[in-house]
C-alpha cells in the first residue's frame, strides 16, 4: 500500500510518501507473516518568487547538472526553471542589431520562421525568443519601412548546461546524506552550484561539495559555436577519505558535445566523454563506505565513460534511425561495461512498426559466478563476461474499420542464446469517455520459454482508478488488482477523485453534478458539483473547460471555461456558477397582448444577472425555479416596467429539447 499525504498552508507544501508491505505466511517454506512500514520521504517546500527558487526542508535530491545527484535530509534552495515564461526557458542566444527606421525583425532557423517582432529605430536586443532545442544558425532579416533589408547570421547550438546571456541558475544545500541503506552513516555535507550565461554564447559553471571526509571543486565552461555545434568542458578536483583507507586525491575531466546536421537530418543530441584518475571518488561513493555494519571496500572505480546518442531522419516516408552507445572502464579491475542500442521506426498509412537491436556486455568476478545455466559467457582474467544480444520487431495496426479504438499488436524477440518469443495482442478502450482501457496478449516461445498469456484492464473513474489483471506462464498463475485515487479536504468539505499529481486543480460548480471535464479521462464532478483535476502544470495557464454535453437537463453554466495559474504543489480552485432549474423560453406580454419590446432586461427574483428580451417578446431563462418573480424593464418610467409572478407547474406550457415553452402576462 502506498500513501502520499500532504498539507497546504499558505505557500508551504508538506508532503510525505509512506509504504506498507505485508507478506502472508508460507507454510511450505516456513516463512512467517511479516509487515513493514517504510517512509520514502517527508519534506516541506515553498516557492520564493523574488529568487525564482524553491526552498525545501526535509528529504530531497540535489541537482545533477554539475555533480551527481545526492539524496539528502536537510535544507536546499534551488532555482526552478518552470517559474520562467516559456519564452525565457532553455537556451537561446541574444539577437542584437541596429534598425534604421521602424522595422520588422524576422528570424529563421533551418528555413522556418521562429520569431517575428517590430522594433523602433536604433539598437535593439531580442532576449525573449523561444528555445528550439536543436541547432542551426539563426538568419535574421531586418526589414526597414522603405522596403530595404539587412541580413545577419547569429550562430546557434545548445547543450543542457547552456544558459541565456545574463541568466543564472544556482543551488545551495546543507544536509545529511540519506542512503537507501539504513546502515550507512548520516554524514553532513554542504553543496553549492552556480551556472551563469555570459555574452557571445558562452556559459560558465562551478560548484563545490564540502564535508569532513570529502571535498570537491568543479569548474566548467560551455560555448555555442553555431554550425560547429555546442561544446562544454569541465574539471572536478576531489579530496576524499574513505572509511578505514588512506586519504585520496583525484580529478575528473568531462567533455560534452551536441550538433544538428540540418542538410543530412542528423542530430547528435549528446556525445560525451569523462575520464577520472585512479584517486577520484564521488561524494556518494565515499559516504557509502561509512557503514555501521561492516567495512565497505571500493574495489571498482570508474576510469572513463563514453556515451553517444544520434538520431537520423531518413526523409519523407523513410522513417528515422537512432543509435545509443555507452562504454565504461574501471580502475583496479578489468571490468568493462558496453551497451549498444540501434532502432529504426516508420509508419505506413496508419500502421506503425519498428526494428530494434541491443547489445549488452557486462562482467562480474568469477568467484560470484556459479550458475551453470549461463552458457553464453566469456571467462577472462578471473571475470565472467556476459554477452547479451537481442533483435526485435514490433508492429501496431489500428482496427477502427471493424472495432473502434482497438489496436492489434505483434512483436518477435530473438536473442543470441537462440530463444525466440512471439507475442500477439489486442488493446483498446471502451465506454463513452474511453476511460476503460484493456489489453489481451498471448506469448509463444520456441524453446518453451515465455509461453503464457495475460489480460489487463484499467478503469479511470470519477472517484479513482481501478486496475485488474491475470496472467499465466510455466512458473504459475498471477492475479493482480489495485485501487488508487486521491482525497482532498478543503474548506467546502471532502472531494474524492483520481490520484493527485504534484499540482492539482479543484473544480467548484455547486449543483452541476456528474459533469465531465474536457481532456481529462474519467474526471467528472461529484453529486455536489466538485471534481479533482490531477497533474496541472505549475506556473502555466491551465484552462479547465466543463463538457456542456454532460450537463443535466436542469443545469446551465454562466461560464464553461476558466483559466488558472497554480504555483508548484498548489491545489488551485476554479469556480463555476451553475443555474439549477428549468430551461424556459418565455413569451412576455403586457397590456393584455402587446409583446415586451426587444432589448428589455429581465431579472429573476432581483438577481444581478439579467437576460435580454429578443424578437416577439421572447426571453430564454435557465436555472429557473418552479416559482418566482421576473422583473422586466425597458425604460425608467413606471409604464415601461412590469413584473411576472410565475408558477411553472400551473401555467400552460409545452416542452421541446428539454426547454419549456410558455407565455406569461407582465403586469
Question: Model-derived features: where do they sit?
Answer:
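Flexible, glycine-rich linker and terminal segments associated
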Residues: 1-104, 108-119, 143, 148-153, ...
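Short consensus segments that form the blades of beta-propeller domains
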Residues: 32-33, 131, 183
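Short, well-ordered loop/turn elements at secondary-structure boundaries
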Residues: 101-102, 120-121, 133-136, 197, ...
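Short acidic/polar hinge/loop motifs at secondary-structure boundaries
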Residues: 119-136, 531-534
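Short acidic loop-to-helix transition motifs that present clustered carboxylates
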Residues: 122-124, 211-214, 238, 328
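Core alpha-helical transmembrane segments of integral membrane proteins
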Residues: 172-181, 186, 190-208, 216-219, ...
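Conserved structured core elements
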Residues: 184-188, 196, 200, 212-215, ...
Amino acid at each position: 500500500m502506498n500513501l502520499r499525504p500532504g498539507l497546504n498552508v499558505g505557500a508551504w507544501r508538506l508532503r510525505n510518501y509512506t509504504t506498507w508491505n505485508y507478506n502472508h505466511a508460507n507454510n511450505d517454506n516456513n516463512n512467517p507473516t511479516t509487515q513493514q512500514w517504510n517512509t520514502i520521504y517527508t519534506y516541506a517546500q515553498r516557492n520564493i518568487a523574488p529568487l525564482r527558487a524553491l526552498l525545501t526542508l526535509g528529504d530531497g535530491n540535489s541537482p545533477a547538472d554539475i555533480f551527481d545527484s545526492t539524496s539528502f535530509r536537510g535544507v536546499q534552495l534551488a532555482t526552478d526553471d518552470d517559474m520562467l515564461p516559456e519564452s525565457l526557458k532553455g537556451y537561446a542566444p541574444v539577437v542584437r542589431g541596429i534598425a534604421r527606421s521602424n522595422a520588422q525583425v524576422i528570424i529563421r532557423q533551418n528555413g522556418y520562421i521562429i520569431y517575428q517582432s517590430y522594433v523602433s529605430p536604433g539598437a535593439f536586443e531580442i532576449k525573449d525568443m523561444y528555445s528550439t532545442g536543436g541547432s542551426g544558425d539563426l538568419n535574421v532579416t531586418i526589414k526597414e519601412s522603405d522596403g530595404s533589408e539587412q541580413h545577419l547570421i547569429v550562430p546557434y547550438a545548445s547543450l543542457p548546461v547552456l544558459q541565456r546571456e545574463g541568466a543564472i541558475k544556482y543551488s545551495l544545500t546543507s544536509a545529511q546524506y540519506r542512503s537507501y541503506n539504513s546502515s550507512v552513516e548520516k554524514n553532513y555535507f554542504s553543496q553549492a552550484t552556480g551556472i551563469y550565461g555570459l555574452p557571445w554564447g558562452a556559459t560558465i559553471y562551478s560548484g563545490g561539495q564540502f564535508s569532513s571526509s570529502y571535498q570537491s571543486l568543479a569548474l566548467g565552461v560551455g560555448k555555442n559555436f553555431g554550425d560547429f555545434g555546442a561544446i562544454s568542458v569541465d574539471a572536478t578536483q576531489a579530496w576524499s577519505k574513505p572509511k578505514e583507507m588512506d586519504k585520496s586525491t583525484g580529478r575528473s575531466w568531462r567533455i560534452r558535445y551536441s550538433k544538428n546536421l540540418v542538410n543530412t537530418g542528423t542530430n547528435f543530441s549528446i556525445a560525451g566523454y569523462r575520464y577520472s584518475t585512479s584517486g577520484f571518488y564521488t561524494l556518494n561513493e565515499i559516504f557509502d563506505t561509512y557503514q555501521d555494519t561492516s567495512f565497505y571496500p571500493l574495489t571498482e572505480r570508474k576510469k572513463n565513460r563514453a556515451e553517444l546518442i544520434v538520431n537520423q531522419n531518413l526523409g519523407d516516408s523513410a522513417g528515422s534511425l537512432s543509435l545509443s552507445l555507452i562504454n565504461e572502464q574501471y580502475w583496479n579491475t578489468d571490468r568493462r561495461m558496453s551497451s549498444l542500442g540501434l532502432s529504426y521506426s516508420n509508419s505506413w498509412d496508419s500502421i506503425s512498426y519498428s526494428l530494434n537491436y541491443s547489445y549488452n556486455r557486462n562482467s562480474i568476478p568469477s568467484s560470484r559466478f556459479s550458475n551453470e545455466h549461463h552458457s553464453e559467457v566469456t571467462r577472462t582474467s578471473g571475470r565472467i563476461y556476459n554477452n547479451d544480444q537481442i533483435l526485435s520487431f514490433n508492429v501496431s495496426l489500428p482496427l477502427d474499420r471493424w472495432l473502434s479504438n482497438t489496436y492489434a499488436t505483434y512483436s518477435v524477440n530473438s536473442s543470441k542464446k537462440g530463444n525466440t518469443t512471439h507475442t500477439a495482442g489486442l488493446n483498446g478502450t471502451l465506454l463513452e469517455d474511453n476511460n476503460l482501457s484493456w489489453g489481451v496478449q498471448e506469448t509463444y516461445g520456441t524453446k518453451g520459454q515465455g509461453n503464457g498469456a495475460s489480460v489487463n484492464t484499467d478503469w479511470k473513474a470519477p472517484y479513482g482508478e481501478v486496475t485488474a489483471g491475470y496472467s499465466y506462464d510455466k512458473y504459475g498463475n498471477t492475479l493482480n488488482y489495485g485501487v488508487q485515487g486521491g482525497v482532498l479536504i478543503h474548506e467546502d468539505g471532502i472531494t474524492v477523485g483520481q490520484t493527485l499529481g504534484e499540482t492539482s486543480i479543484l473544480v467548484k460548480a455547486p449543483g452541476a453534478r456528474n459533469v465531465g471535464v474536457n481532456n481529462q479521462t474519467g474526471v467528472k464532478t461529484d453529486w455536489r458539483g466538485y471534481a479533482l483535476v490531477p497533474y496541472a502544470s505549475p506556473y502555466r495557464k491551465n484552462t479547465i473547460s466543463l463538457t456542456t454535453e454532460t450537463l443535466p437537463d436542469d443545469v446551465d453554466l454562466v461560464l464553461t471555461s476558466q483559466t488558472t495559474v497554480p504555483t508548484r504543489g498548489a491545489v488551485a480552485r476554479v469556480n463555476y456558477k451553475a443555474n439549477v432549474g428549468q430551461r424556459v423560453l418565455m413569451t412576455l406580454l403586457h397590456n393584455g397582448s402587446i409583446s415586451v419590446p426587444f432589448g428589455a432586461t429581465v431579472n429573476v427574483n432581483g438577481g444581478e444577472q439579467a437576460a435580454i428580451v429578443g424578437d416577439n417578446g421572447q426571453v430564454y431563462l435557465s436555472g429557473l425555479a418552479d416559482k418566482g418573480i421576473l422583473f422586466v424593464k425597458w425604460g425608467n418610467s413606471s409604464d415601461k416596467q412590469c413584473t411576472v409572478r410565475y408558477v411553472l407547474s400551473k401555467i400552460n406550457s409545452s416542452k421541446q429539447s428539454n426547454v419549456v415553452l410558455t407565455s406569461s402576462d407582465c403586469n
